[in-house]
Amino acid sequence: MSERNLPGGEMSSLILDFFWLADCSGSMNGEKIQTLNYAIRQTIPDMRKEADDNPNASIMVRAVKFSDGAAWHVPTATAIEDFNWTDLTAGGVTAMGMALELVAGELRQFPTDTKRLPPVLVLLTDGQPTDDFKKGLDELLLTPWGKKAVRIAIAIGKDTDLDVLEQFTGNRELVLEAKNPQLLVKFIKWASTVVKNVSAPMVGDAAGGGIDVNTIPTAAADDDEIW
């Protein structure tokens, strides 16, 4: 575990694991996947600033992509200071359950120590699972860190299964409906900022613990409604 030299002596750094879970199915082709790629790239400077402002927590980022199957897009936990985003392309179906299983397998390897903050999982999708979503979710929630995780879902467009996403988040307020490109960018940027809340001293086991839902962005009067 990394340590940082701080004024007043050496102090162990807490680890905050951040996971993007991105739908790359065929229905995401075009503006949706382009906007997703753009928005995630835009989050990087703000997340780096948050890491600078909170030297007691190390933000480590991973990413999963899912379509016909699920695979690591960023397989190695990468410090936000070194993190870069490679654009995704779209095609295939929506193996959301497999994506959750992949993350569950990673969380299962985490030690149950006090040097880790609850992980943040951000799921982005525009459709419905085409595989066994419940199996994947059950595996995730059976892991101690999966149960403690702050789980946020961003529904892209009007065809997303909101009930499925609420099962993932455990909190309807953390299912964000992006009906246009402007809202998708706003929601992705907002989701990246929850690291500030999670790194606060008190975070409960419940999904969304410590997150101020009043800060979730809303649509502007001039936003398009095209999805």
Question: Regions from the language model: what does each represent?
Answer:
Residues 1-227:
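Acidic, low-complexity intrinsically disordered regions
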